[in-house]
Amino acid sequence: MTKTERYLQLRSMIPEMRRIKRIHFVGIGGAGMGGIAEVLVNEGYVVSGSDIAQNAVTDRLCLLGAKIHIGHGADNVQQADVVVVSTAINPENPEIIAAKELRIPIVRRAEMLAELMRYRHGVAIAGTHGKTTTTSLIASLYGQAGRDPTFVIGGLLNSAGTNARLGTSRYLIAEADESDASFLHLQPMVSVVTNIEADHMDTYGGDFEKLKSTFVDFLHNLPFYGVAVVCIDDAVVREIMPRIGRHMITYGFSDDADVQALNFHQQGHQCRFTVRRKGKEDLDLLLNLPGQHNVLNALAAIAVATEDEIDDSAIIQALAEFQGIGRRFQHLGKFATPKGEVMLVDDYGHHPSEVAATIKAARAGWPDKRLVMAYQPHRYTRTRDLYEDFIEVLSQVDCLLLLEVYSAGEAPIPGADGRALCRSIRLRGQLDPIFIASPDQLAEVLPDVLQEGDLLLTQGAGNIGALSRQLAASELGFSIAATTEVKP
């Protein structure tokens, strides 16, 4: 059976959403929203959307046939049968108001994802950290095995050139977002929980116990024959395990893990390790990603693939040839500066644990390099809630350039801004950070800071990623020239 025939057979088994032909997305430029929109375009729905600015996601959707509006306006929703919104959208948005007046159904992003998953074999990946990488690895393993899954990922899968794709099989692999508790809409066949930490606590009323219980509820959305794949190395995940009334597969470095990593060794961007699985032969693996945290992500993917009887040869090849994800320890090249050549890496991590994992991976892979970090805090609330943790983690680099907080629409909070954080790190006495009041000042400061052999790490979830790419392309007047090809 050809891929086309297989897809047509699949479509005949999946009922279309009744009366729904035209779907409008408010905030379509986000990775999660754009990914769902791309799948729906390819399923034949008429898709439109709006966002405040043009970006790579909106450009790609335009090429696929979606109608994109830059800016929000009531007229944009007039022909829609349903309107999809993300949590970031203000309820007073004119398109939301117009949809309510016109009695057009308004659904959250996760509700639309749940609809896509309803008649498929869903694999949902949740957790405070590692969702995007784990989802990407699972999608790559299934693709390598010829399963041709549909996937929706919160970052660009480099090998596919996109963060979403409509496959021809019954599989749908997707991130599950706990930030607004909307992952409770999903009803997958397999659920992964990578870890649980205090983040997005406003959603849970500042109650960590409520957050933990919500993860348990998420796992109980599995059918009684479903599988929960959980990281036993995470203390909070281990704590909630007795409450999970579903079949579980555990993974980690711990001796009691069902899928265990042994003999870990990192060299540069790659890791080697042995995976031990109950009832299966050990596998010696090469992972084309740096850091122990990425080995944990790979173990989750291996556990899911092994449970679904994917051949070991596909696992071995997919991990060794994995091309990475955009903004996840993404190597952008080596560059000549006035004082010598430096290596530029860009990473999305913005929680203290994520930043710590990135620093650890950089130290392990390039132990002789001086680590220079340009860090942009993300959200005032996160900076406030995890202030002491940020002081501890950011003090671990050799040189710190600290940008002002990227607000993500939040109002400033006194004492939780970049200048205050910079002052607190300086008072700790381990590091003397440089405060960057405006992003456009970064390129002015770097030539005086960087030295021969440095590893420059741009870190954060705001517009620091765009700045990093502008640096790589020398678009900010930064007096460097690429000495190696910049990777996408």
Swiss-Prot record:
Pfam families: Mur_ligase, Mur_ligase_C, Mur_ligase_M. One of its GO terms (molecular function) is UDP-N-acetylmuramate-L-alanine ligase activity. It catalyses: UDP-N-acetyl-alpha-D-muramate + L-alanine + ATP = UDP-N-acetyl-alpha-D-muramoyl-L-alanine + ADP + phosphate + H(+). Pathway: Cell wall biogenesis; peptidoglycan biosynthesis. ATP binds at residues 127-133. Its EC number is 6.3.2.8. The lineage of its organism: Bacteria, Pseudomonadati, Pseudomonadota, Gammaproteobacteria, Alteromonadales. Cell wall formation. Keywords: ATP-binding, Cell cycle, Cell division, Cell shape, Cell wall biogenesis/degradation, Cytoplasm, Ligase, Nucleotide-binding, Peptidoglycan synthesis. The gene is murC. GO terms for biological process: cell division; cell wall organization; peptidoglycan biosynthetic process; regulation of cell shape. It is found in: Cytoplasm. This is UDP-N-acetylmuramate--L-alanine ligase. GO terms for cellular component: cytoplasm. Belongs to the MurCDEF family. InterPro entries: Mur-like_cat_sf, Mur_ligase_C, Mur_ligase_C_dom_sf, Mur_ligase_cen, Mur_ligase_N, MurCDEF_pg_biosynth, UDP-N-AcMur_Ala_ligase_MurC. It is an enzyme of class 6 (ligase).
